[in-house]
Amino acid sequence: MRNVKVLLLYPKFPKTFWSFKYALPFIGKRAAFPPLGLLTVAALLPKEWGKKLVDLNTQKLNEKDINWADFVFISAMVAQKESVKEVISQVKRFNKKIVAGGPLFTISYEEFLNDIDYFVLGEAEVTLPLFLENLKNSTLQKIIKPEPNQWPDISQTVVPLWELIDMKKYASMSIQFSRGCPFNCEFCDIILLNGRVPRIKDKIQILKELDALYNLNWRGNVFFVDDNFISNKINLKEKVLPAIIKWGERKKHPFIFNTQVSINIADDKELMDLMVRAGFNTVFIGIESPNEESLKGCNKFQNINRNLLESIRIIQNQGLEVQGGFIIGFDQDTPSIFNQMSLFIQRSGIVTAMVGLLQAPPKTRLWERLRKEKRLISQPTGSNTDCTINFQPKMNLHSLISGYKRTVNHIYSPKNYYQRLMNFLKEYKPRVKRNYQLTFERFLAFLKSIWILGIKEKERVYYWKIFFWALIKKPRLFPIIIEMAIKGFHFRKISEEYSKITTH
C-alpha cells in the first residue's frame, strides 16, 4: 500500500459554557482542549503515512491542505454539527474521500449517508484496523461499526500523536485513564459510546503518556477526560495514583490535573487524599438536581439518599474544587425548581456551576421513552445551555425557558458569582503546597484582569473587594481567585448572550 496522506480535521465548537471563548484571550490561548480522539487515531495510522491535523478551533482550513490529502478524516461531537456540515461542503468541492468517526457519527451516522464516503464508527481501536485492512485489499465498505458490546482493551492503546498540534494554542492537554461508566442515567449517551463496564489503562501506560507530554515541554493543566475517573477505585488507589505521585515528585510536579467523578468520591477520604497528592485540584460532578424526585426519575441513584451539600463540602474541604453539572427540565420539575436550583448552587459554594436544559440524545433510554410518548420534537443541538430543548416538556415550554434564563442570569450575576466564590474559599482547604510559577502568560492574564474586570466591566466592585480580601486573608489562593474571576466573566457573557435568544 502506497504512502497515503491523511488530513485530520476537527470542526469548530460554537460559543458554549465550556468553550471559554471570553476567558481564553486573557491567557493568549485559542482553545481549551486539543482533539484527543483524532490525535489517537493519527497514532493508530501506519507510521509511514503522511499526516496533518487542522483544529478549526485554533486555525483556518486552507485549500493547500485539502489538495495535499488523499483522505480527509473528520471526528466530531454533537455540538460541532454545524461546523461539520460546513467542513464537508468545503472538502467535497475538492473531490476528496471523507472518512468520519467519533461520537456524532457513531450515534447519528444516518444523517450523513449522502455526504460521507466511509464511516468508521465506535472506538477506533476496534474499527480503524478493519478500515485499513479493507483499504489494503481494495475492499472498502461504506460503514464499519463494532459488534454489539465489542469494546477494545484500552491498555493496548497507543500514545496520542501530540507532535501534530501546536501545544501553545491550548489551555490544557488531555489524557484518558478509563472508558465506560457503571451507572445508567436515563439521559446519558456514554454507555452507548463506551459501555457500562469501565475499562482501564495500566499505570505503565499512564506514565508513558505523561512522559510524552513532559518531553514535549508541556507544563500546566492536564485534563483526565474520563466520564467517571473513579469507576475503578481499587486500581486507582493501589496502582495508578501512587505511580503518578512518585512520577510527580521526580519531575517536580509539572502538571495540575482535573477530571470528572461521581459524588460518591465524598465517601472515600483515602482516594481524595491520593488524588490531591497526585496533583488533582478540580473535579467535575454531575449533581443534576436538588430535587430528589427528579434524580429518581432520571435514574441518578448515586446522588440520592445523601446530603448533597454536605458531600460537596467534604470534597472541597479535602482540597478538591467541585465544578457542578445541573439540569432543568425533568418531568418531575415544577416551577419551584428555578428558585430551588439557585439557592442550592449559592449555598454549595460551587463556583463553576453549569446549568443546562435537559436534552434527549438519540438512542438513549430517555430518547426511546420520549419517542414512545410521542414527545420528541427534533435532534439535540449538542449544547444544553443554548436555551433549546428537543422534546415537549411536562412544564409549560415558555415557563421552562424563561425560568431557565432567570436561573442562569441569577447565578452568574457579579453579585452572586463573587458571593459563591467567597463561600468556596471559606470551605476549600488545599492539602498540598505546590510551588506556583509566575509565568509571563499568567502575569499578562493578571494585568488583563485588572483592566477588563477591575475597570471596564460591571463586576469591578466585586472584583476589587475579593482582590484585597484575598491578598490579606488568602494570599496563597490569590492566583486561583484571579483565574476564577476570569472564568466568571466568561460565564456571565455567555449567559447574557443566551438570555437574548428568542424562543417560540
What do these predicted ranges mean?
Residues 156-323, 328-330, 334-343:
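Radical SAM [4Fe-4S] cluster-binding motif and immediate context
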Residues 8, 74, 121, 224-226, ...:
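Conserved beta-strand positions
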Residues 2-8, 50, 65, 135, ...:
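Radical SAM enzyme core and accessory elements
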Residues 2-218:
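Acidic, low-complexity intrinsically disordered segments
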Residues 13-19, 108-110, 183, 232-234, ...:
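Flexible glycine/acidic-rich beta-alpha junction loops that bind and position SAM and/or redox cofactors
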Residues 54-58, 147-151, 155-157, 321, ...:
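A C-terminal junction/extension of Radical SAM enzymes
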Residues 111-130, 274-282, 342-355:
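Structural recognition of alpha->loop->beta junctions
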